[in-house]
Regions:
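Bacterial N-terminal signal peptides that target proteins for export
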Residues: 2-13
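A broad, low-specificity signal marking well-ordered, structured residues that form hydrophobic/aromatic
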Residues: 43, 89, 133
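Surface-exposed short loop/turn segments
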Residues: 73-130, 138-149
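Bacterial N-terminal signal peptides
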Residues: 14-23
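C-terminal/domain-edge helix-coil "capping" segments
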Residues: 27, 123-131, 138-174
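Soluble non-cytosolic domains of exported or imported proteins
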Residues: 54-65, 108, 112, 149-161
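A structural "domain/chain start" motif
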Residues: 23-68, 72-78, 125, 168-174
Length: 174
């Protein structure tokens, strides 16, 4: 009889623990954006020009389109190409520079492509939220590769990283 009572207590305690923990939940989430005010509904991305001393002709159109797509796909904002957009994004490629970062003896072993972007963000509903800042993406690569090879193979990576950096400057409060 004693064994029966002990086993019954174990079953009841086990059932109660399962029952209690089934209602206890913990939710953790990570979003790339801070909350966008409810009155902000539209955005406009102006053509992002290339004003660097060296112009990669593919960079500006790709940067412009990828930034638009990132905002459309990750926020609730609608694109508006008029002057009355709530968020107005503009800017230009300010730097496109190749440098040597690694040397062995008298030979370069590693090079760096630095791509800088000057961001101008206007919040037409709250001037205090306007931003004017610079972002830079550095890509290190083997010095035996040429710039056209790197632009061809790493162009999407460069654009993606710049878009992420621009997006985070606008939408994240980190």
């Amino acid at each position: 009889m004693q064994t029966f009572i002990t086993n019954t207590k174990k079953w009841i305690i086990g059932f109660l623990l399962i029952f209690i923990f089934s209602f206890a939940t913990c939710k953790y989430g990570f979003k790339d954006t801070s909350p966008i005010p409810i009155d902000v509904k539209t955005f406009r991305v102006n053509y992002l020009e290339n004003k660097a001393s060296y112009v990669n002709p593919q960079l500006s159109p790709q940067l412009t389109e990828k930034l638009k797509q990132k905002i459309i796909n990750t926020t609730r904002l609608r694109q508006n190409n008029n002057d009355d957009a709530h968020y107005d994004v503009s800017g230009y490629v300010s730097q496109y520079q190749l440098s040597t970062t690694g040397i062995s003896g008298t030979n370069a072993t590693q090079s760096r492509l630095s791509v800088g972007f000057h961001l101008i963000f206007k919040n037409t509903l709250d001037d205090k939220k306007n931003i004017e800042t610079d972002v830079v993406y550095n890509l290190d690569f083997d010095a035996n590769k040429t710039l056209p090879e790197i632009e061809s193979s790493q162009g999407p990576v460069i654009v993606s990283n710049l878009v992420d950096a621009i997006f985070n400057k606008i939408f994240s409060n980190w």
